[in-house]
Amino acid sequence: MSEWKKNDKFETVIEDISETGEGIGKTDGFTWFIKDTVIGDRVEAKAMKTKKSYGFARMERILEPSKNRVEPKCPVARQCGGCQLQAMDYKEQLTFKERKIYNNLTRIGGFTEIPMLPIIGMDEPWRYRNKAQFPWGMDKEDNIITGFYAGRTHSIIGCEDCLLGIEENEDILKIIKAHMERFGLRLYDEETHKGLIRHTLIRKGFKTGELMVCQVINGKSLPHQEELVEELLKIPGMTSISYSVNREKTNVIMGNQVENLYGPGYISDYIGDVKYRISPLSFYQVNPVQTEKLYGTALEYAGLTGGETVWDLYCGIGTISLFLAQKAKKVYGVEIVPQAIEDARENAKLNGMENVEFFVGKAEEVLPEQFEKNQVYADVIVVDPPRKGCDEVCLDTIVKMGPKRVVYVSCDSATLARDLKYLAERGYELSRVRGCDMFPHSGHVETVALLTLV
Ligand code: SAH
């Protein structure tokens, strides 16, 4: 055990930021994780919980602020669990993310020369989210409030106007709150599993201006629906109003079923020239502006001239597949979630694209099977796996198929580095790497890498 005890005070300088956004400082070789700090801050902190070689501490006082420290724009930035980097100047956030990618590629990937292009940041890193799910609760004076969960808890921090979200959120939430008060609707209580009103889902198509509201309820129907619809329709752009029944004791927000109250049951949006239909339950990237840049980069790296056969592994609802299909002869998508593939096929039809075909299944099963049985071929393979990266069987099959180019889109640069190393040891050369900031003020960063067969 360390000699540190709870509530011990100490001084340290923040040198780095953890995966989850805490500042990292040291005292005589002991490592501290301290929330709400920025690289370069000299702080006084208080020990909360200690292990053998590291501990968690609470920031008590900033003794000397980092030159990159800024006043968070959002008044609840410190309590809310949503943003980790708001106190860091946006330029510095981008530098931090770029360095994270670079460090992982050198430390884990073993690369010495990294052909890195400047990270793609946002010109305006606020109000970029097209989707929000607001929980409802009571404050100490028994007022109805909504906002966001404080980090790692279910206590609600009141905030109707998150600065990452759209401006319409606030007006929509006011209408829903007024409706609850007017008709005495009860809030859902997680502990007793009683009460009706659960989360409110709000989505917007940034290119179309279309708005969607879906109210989640613990009950069969939403009382006084007509009055609610009438009020919500006063908001310009309101296109789809529905409710979702979720009677389970669960942290999952949406129920499986959606009942339509107004409109076609979906909204539409575009990424580039490709149109997407978004229903309350369908997956859609939350930052459409950066998604367009990210997929634009993937498309550029794919180097398509119109004659290529492309595989898009981990394709989700086919966003990248359809983007590529604009410039390829044929695109095959593979995704494990059947519902996502239904959406992908629907979106292909919506855009009149006939040169795409989708498979439901694991990439590491579908690809080897198609390769061994049907000798399928690829000029280019694009992968966009979840955080854990690609399965080795999948990488191995890619190597066997020997496409000229592999484009790797990643949301975790540590597993990216591991997988790139595997491919680089088997005939591929790392030709380009570029970060893209999809989630300003959070610690996350997306990366696109291009590998070329040598
Ligand atoms: N490119 C997609 C998003 C990819 S997110 C888009 O833009 O919509 C990663 C996707 O991989 C998720 O949809 C997830 O369901 C899927 N997935 C996870 N494990 C998988 C596996 N073993 N094989 C295929 N798909 C998988």
Language-model-detected regions and their locations in the chain:
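Short, acidic/hydrophobic/Gly-rich beta-strand patch recurrent on exposed beta strands
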Residues: 23-28, 147-150, 214-216, 344
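Conserved loop-to-beta-strand segment in the C-terminal subdomain of adenylate-forming
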Residues: 54, 208-212, 443
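Flexible loop/N-cap segments at domain edges
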Residues: 200
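Rossmann-like S-adenosyl-L-methionine
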Residues: 2-11, 19, 220, 224-235, ...
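Short, conserved phosphate/pyrophosphate- and ester-handling motifs at nucleotide-, phospho-/glycolipid
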Residues: 40, 165, 287
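Short beta-strand micro-motifs enriched in acidic
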Residues: 46-50, 135-139, 203-207, 454
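Extended interfacial segments that mediate partner engagement and assembly in macromolecular machines
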Residues: 60-72, 78-187, 207, 222
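Terminal RNA-binding accessory module
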Residues: 1-72, 76, 357-358, 365
